[in-house]
Amino acid sequence: MDFGQPTDESAEAARKAMARAKEDLQKGLFDVLITGPVKSNPNPPREDRALTMMASDMVRIGLVTTHLPIKEVAQAITVEKIVDKGTIFHTSLRRDFRISSARIAVLALNPQQGTEEEQVIKPAVETLETKGIQAYGPYVADEFFGSGLYYDFDGVLAMYDDQGVVPFKTLAPEYSVKLKAGISAVVVTPDHGPAFDIAGKGEADEQSMRHAIYTAIDMFRHRADYDEPLSNPLPKLYHEKREDGDKARFAIKAKDQFKTPPEK
């Protein structure tokens, strides 16, 4: 293998390295996985239950759909999918980034309000609101980013790749990262390609990789802090008496607990 020359052998080595990393991660041999920049898969999976997220100090953008031709996006967007991705996004903002009251902007699909906005995106936003998620929109993408409205939100949910990637690259051209939300492992990668043209020349800027490492460490610590108080919830201290509808407060299972002690 030569520097800057992708081959079948190098692709196979990358696949084996990733398979071994997943295996060791499942065994608990390490806590977070940071992957180096890789060449895009020419045949990526069309469906991904996880949420692809791009993050920088300025903006965080999640994608409802990925790797789809633009002509297929409208058909792929459903209320259920937006709600699912929006819920994952909200959880990640709270758990991975420790934003206690996350505000999410949902982008429109069309430059003007169309069928998808009225029949799909708006109902999805309303459903997210009923779940206690602060979701707003839909916002027209160019107006949203052009006016700087993204400053008012903790995350932006885009409908497809270019709608999120293009403004993200413009706003955060350096030191940004990409991660998968909605999976148990912490997996982060620098948000740029392998730059084969400068491979082996000692010219690459390591700051993006450094930022990916720091982000992964922060996410791991944030998850531990978020999960710790939820690991041992207090037992329910009352139950509903179905036979008469009365509520017996502080009903404890232990029969002898709270008994009046015998007189001495």
Q: Predicted regions span which residues?
A:
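Anion-binding alpha/beta catalytic cores of soluble intermediary-metabolism enzymes, centered on
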Residues: M1-K264
